[in-house]
Amino acid sequence: MNHTSDTALLIVNLGTPEAPTAAAVRRYLGEFLSDRRVVSIPPLFWKPLLHMVILPIRGPRSASKYAKVWLQEGSPLSVYTRRIAEGLTQHLPDWRVAWAMRYGAPALTKALDALQAQQVRRIVILPLYPQYSTTTTASVQDVVEAWCKRTPQVQVECIQDYAEDPAWVAAVAASIRRHWQAHGRSEKLMFSFHGLPQRVANNGDPYPQRCQVSASLIAAALNLNESEWVLGYQSRFGTERWLQPYAEPTLWALAESGIRRFDLVCPGFSVDCLETLEEVALGFSETLAARGATMRYIPCLNDDPAHVQALAGLAQRALL
């Protein structure tokens, strides 16, 4: 199919504060935690708790964490997402390529409006969540579907996920191999994925199965046996039970069993962000060091050329 400028690819990531300040973080978290896909507590109870308790506490606390990982160009998540979009223009020369965030800026709806204003007739939406979840991908789809209802003349295709896409799996495996070639192999590799409440999975969210599929395929590409890798879930929020095993306590238990050297990669994150750089690369490393063990963080694919090429392939196949 010969794609011209009436075809566009819109990559969508989660979002980020515009600055590592308490005010900016509060604005961002206020939008993020108001999404019923993310927090399903009835608004009558949740909104007062969010605005009177959670945001005043988490705003300053999270701002200090963002400051630790903020780049000169801006938020890592924003910087790398933009670089991916720039790279995609090289692989898709006959497409328009844009990027947006589900929360914060550049806003998803505004990005869609801008593409329509450029006379785009077909848009492929690619949420940068390798593993589908109702809490992430479906939230993007909600916004896109609402926009499509008032813009029926534009054909929109939304990619569900790419948890087992061969090119993506190969790119992740290659990044791990490069790390091993440069630094040597550890005793255990952990695949750490963002967690979500267990009740969400109990209600039918396929996310844990998609994470398991991704981890198993990457491990197979690396010729690892089951004793050489482990899966865990990070970034738990609140007091309810989340997906298990929890990543950090699992590492602690393994360290106490005698394992002293770990590598950790986060295949559920397309680009590095607060959760990978501050929580994992800094936080997990510190707590393991206190237990006499070391952990080396393997960065996300970010704007790795193999990652960009894999995403371009997903977009092209979406219109076949």
Swiss-Prot record:
List ligand-binding residues for Fe cation.
H194, E275
Major location (coarse) = cytoplasm
Q: In which pathway does it act?
A: Porphyrin-containing compound metabolism; protoheme biosynthesis; protoheme from protoporphyrin-IX: step 1/1
GO CC, sorted alphabetically, is:
cytoplasm
What EC number(s) does this enzyme carry?
4.98.1.1
Keywords noted in UniProt: Cytoplasm, Heme biosynthesis, Iron, Lyase, Metal-binding, Porphyrin biosynthesis
Localization, per the record, is: Cytoplasm
Chemical reaction(s) catalysed: heme b + 2 H(+) = protoporphyrin IX + Fe(2+)
According to the lineage, what is the superkingdom?
A: Bacteria
What is the main EC category here?
lyase
Q: Known Pfam families for this protein?
A: Ferrochelatase
Keyword Lipid metabolism on entry:
no
Biological process (GO), any one? heme biosynthetic process
Q: Record keywords: Lyase included?
A: yes
One GO molecular function term? ferrochelatase activity
Identify the HAMAP family for this entry. Ferrochelatase (MF_00323)
For this protein, the record's NCBIfam families field holds: hemH
The protein's job, in short, is: Catalyzes the ferrous insertion into protoporphyrin IX.
Similarity comment: family membership: Belongs to the ferrochelatase family.
Q: List the protein's name.
A: Ferrochelatase
Lineage, please?
Bacteria, Pseudomonadati, Pseudomonadota, Gammaproteobacteria, Lysobacterales
